[in-house]
A protein has these predicted regions:
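Class II aminoacyl-tRNA synthetase catalytic cores and aaRS-like
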Residues: 1-486
Length: 486
């Protein structure tokens, strides 16, 4: 985003005039102050025309200015809200008044004054003292048109936040959502931990990693693609309820539902299974929505969605048969399923990858109401426990809302010999060219050999959850600085 050079030059000239007059345009501090939101709450019932003796000290950015003669009004905004400032020459004195009314939009100031309500009922602060806290050298985005170019909004998020109330609301919802998710887990006895972001082996998901190099150790390391394996080792160690909320990294494409750097929550509970985790997930999402939005009903693409439990459960086989007209159980080989799909798969795509593709293309977009797709093929779930009544399946679900997958869960595989066989199968897939297959993690297998109790685990995409709660059409709308192509 560029501004006319004469506007920039004019602001620079004002900066130099301030310094010439002995006014510091970038002081060190302002001291104790109140949030504007607190001031508004304290006087929410003030009747029109009433002036109080209640003194307040606030700071923020000047976003509007109007008035003439010996009185003026300015709008001041901080991170909690906006309030009108009433400035009068007979209160401030001529010099302070003139400096105030000639501020540029975007300048940051601190003010002291008393609360009043104008005859129209607008809560205001009668300014008695003020101070420049930061001179803005670039103009704000256009007041009426905002910042409309999508690419600029993502690259210059600070301008987007200044210009668009919808953006500010989105990221308030995001912050509150993360806070409420943590509160829910803490209240249910889970311990928050931190595990390595730089890992000697990547694992816990089917994805390509980012590779980096540690100079002192002279070895390659990987940015984690998931926290799963470390967290399950902690379950082995006796932390029966454990979670981590942080960044994962996957070297994959960018789309409305994918960003290479994303915020993921994983939690594990000893002595639970995928039925218990499904109940917990639907309760968590509904309770977070209620606390953040004040309702469990949201809107996406013009459709109302109720997050109230219980959510629908349907098997993967039933969902694909219903939406794609293919019974995957009747096509148990790669060749048979490819023929039924009328496709020529990539040599690295096995039967499981084809099933996953059917789910993504034919089923996922239709899952508007909250739905658990349950019971997946073992081929695409290397860390899930075999189904208790069908050896060809594993106990796994994925949760979908508004056509978006938001969470994934297993009854965790805790048989070390079976886990070793699964790793060997994944290693073979890796040798055949599947860049998303898992490398063999001997340390994890040895941890399982110590004995891991029956465990249920969940991965919840925080970015996608915020997408659902805000109605955002793309992940990039809910990530402050998303990855860009150029």
């Amino acid at each position: 985003m560029t501004e006319p050079s004469d506007l920039l030059a004019e602001r620079r000239q004002k900066l130099e005039r301030l310094r010439a007059e002995g006014i510091e345009p970038f002081p060190h501090e302002f001291g104790e102050r109140e949030d504007i939101g607190e001031v508004r709450a304290a006087h929410s019932g003030l009747a029109p025309g009433i002036e109080t003796e209640s003194r307040h000290r606030v700071a923020g950015r000047v976003v509007a200015r109007r008035g003439h003669g010996k009185a003026a009004f300015l709008d001041l905004r901080d991170g909690t809200g906006q309030i009108q400032l009433h400035a009068r020459e007979d209160v401030l004195g001529q010099e302070a008044f003139e400096l105030l009314v000639h501020l540029d939009l975007g300048d940051i100031i601190g003010v002291e004054g008393t609360a009043l309500a104008t005859r129209r009922g607008e809560l205001s602060i009668q300014v008695t003292r003020w101070r420049l806290l930061a001179k803005s050298l670039r103009p704000l985005p256009d007041k009426y048109h905002g910042l409309e170019d999508t690419e600029t909004r993502y690259r210059r998020r600070e301008l987007d936040l200044l210009a668009n109330e919808d953006t500010r609301r989105t990221f308030r919802v995001r912050a509150q959502t993360i806070s409420e998710v943590r509160r829910w887990l803490d209240d249910h006895g889970f311990a928050e931990v931190e595990t390595p972001v730089l890992q000697p082996l990547y694992g816990g998901a089917l994805a390509r990693p980012f590779v980096t190099h540690h100079n002192a150790l002279d070895r390659d390391l990987y940015l984690r693609i998931a926290t799963e394996l470390y967290l399950k080792r902690l379950v082995v160690g006796g932390i029966d309820r454990v979670y981590e909320l942080g960044k994962d990294f996957r070297n994959e494409g960018i789309s409305p539902k994918h960003n290479p750097e994303f915020t993921m929550l994983e939690w594990y509970e000893a002595y639970a299974d995928y039925r218990k985790t499904a109940e917990d997930l639907e309760r968590l999402v509904a309770e977070v929505a209620e606390r953040v939005l004040g309702t469990t009903k949201i809107e996406r693409d013009g459709k109302e969605i109720d997050l109230t439990p219980p959510w629908r459960r349907v098997t993967l086989r039933e969902a694909i048969r219903e939406r794609a007209g293919i019974d995957i159980a009747e096509h148990p080989s790669r060749e048979a399923l490819a023929a039924a799909m009328d496709t020529e798969p990539d040599p690295a795509e096995g039967w499981g990858k084809l099933v996953d593709g059917l789910l993504s293309r034919s089923v996922e977009p239709e899952l508007i109401e909250p739905t658990f797709i349950v019971d997946y093929p073992v081929e695409i779930s290397p860390f899930a426990k075999r189904h208790r009544s069908d050896e060809g399946l594993v106990e796994r679900w994925e949760a979908f809302v508004g056509g978006v997958e938001i969470a994934n869960s297993f009854t965790e595989l805790n048989d070390p010999d079976e886990q070793r066989r699964r790793f060997e199968q994944q290693a073979e897939e890796l040798r055949r060219g599947d860049e998303e297959a898992q490398p063999f993690d001997e340390a994890f297998v040895e941890a399982l050999e110590q004995g891991m109790p029956p465990t249920g685990g969940v991965g919840l995409g925080i970015d996608r959850l915020v997408m659902i709660l805000t109605g955002a059409p793309s992940l990039r709308e809910v990530v402050l600085f998303p990855a860009m192509r150029t």
